[in-house]
């Protein structure tokens, strides 16, 4: 096997552009209406507000600037007023890692916002043929305690704000040269033509539907046609099954849906994904059947981690087909990623192939996720912030296998 090549960049502990603006309100993550009200509060005349909001929206989300002084068509006195009252700074980059397969991972630090100390989250970029996918976090930590997932062993610290969700996308586009007049980074692979980030998945740290309002606001801004302009068919929200908010996601956001399923019987899913005790399979599947716009072109993705002698029998495969009957679906099979202290093992490869063949023969797409970014510890079920993570020499990182292939091509 070829030697692994990893680039690690550590930023200084104090980054003035990120940290000094942290005490000011941010314009990132605000709706147009909220941004307009913020401008009125600093004395912008009503007759100018709509024009100023349009200017700011374009500079922040189309041009990707993070400094008011770069807004060259905004009068200097207005730029000074904006600088005095607001920020559009990016979060602090604690660490950036680049895998030899092009996978990139950023450890980002945000201000406390009531958490008592600064908090850290990770986001991951996966380049593929003709597309690039960004995996975004929605919470610091997680409440779900799924027994096979190492990320779930980190206690929930707090929800991320809409600005903090969006800033992961903005920062990644900065680092990838994905805004106009920006150069792509030298070295690891990124798509040569078109946008570097074509797809976005809410599959990082946390349960996004336990932070519904902020995630909703962030995704509606990310898909706004006059800004970041990501197609809703290229945004996937992954949930462990918060049923009431699945209905709201379809009605109020309209992005693609992925379900962390992992079992076809309530008694087993109660163990693997404890939220099932509150929202059992019957209710979850009913919500999926009623998700708006389902078709062969807009399928729900069901994630299924392969656990040896737990959920990998052909009887489980038959149960999976029966459970999803009539739902336009894609079933992602994920080889389990062992981590120190877990009692689970990955299914044997032959068994995974038999399981996949059975699913495929029933007419369902059933890709087996292959590891990406394992050399930079960026893989499925392993995202964990620096203060809570295991020693790197002990960690097996495979989160990225879960990320790739989500969303539909327009």
Swiss-Prot record:
Its EC number is 2.1.1.192. Its cofactor is [4Fe-4S] cluster. Its main location: cytoplasm. Keywords: 4Fe-4S, Cytoplasm, Disulfide bond, Iron, Iron-sulfur, Metal-binding, Methyltransferase, rRNA processing, S-adenosyl-L-methionine, Transferase, tRNA processing. S-adenosyl-L-methionine binds at residues 206-207, 238, 260-262, 337. GO terms for biological process: rRNA base methylation; tRNA methylation. It catalyses: adenosine(2503) in 23S rRNA + 2 reduced [2Fe-2S]-[ferredoxin] + 2 S-adenosyl-L-methionine = 2-methyladenosine(2503) in 23S rRNA + 5'-deoxyadenosine + L-methionine + 2 oxidized [2Fe-2S]-[ferredoxin] + S-adenosyl-L-homocysteine; adenosine(37) in tRNA + 2 reduced [2Fe-2S]-[ferredoxin] + 2 S-adenosyl-L-methionine = 2-methyladenosine(37) in tRNA + 5'-deoxyadenosine + L-methionine + 2 oxidized [2Fe-2S]-[ferredoxin] + S-adenosyl-L-homocysteine. CDD domains: Radical_SAM. One of its GO terms (molecular function) is 4 iron, 4 sulfur cluster binding. Specifically methylates position 2 of adenine 2503 in 23S rRNA and position 2 of adenine 37 in tRNAs. m2A2503 modification seems to play a crucial role in the proofreading step occurring at the peptidyl transferase center and thus would serve to optimize ribosomal fidelity. NCBIfam families: rRNA_mod_RlmN. Reaction proceeds by a ping-pong mechanism involving intermediate methylation of a conserved cysteine residue. This is Dual-specificity RNA methyltransferase RlmN. The lineage of its organism: Bacteria, Pseudomonadati, Pseudomonadota, Alphaproteobacteria, Hyphomicrobiales.
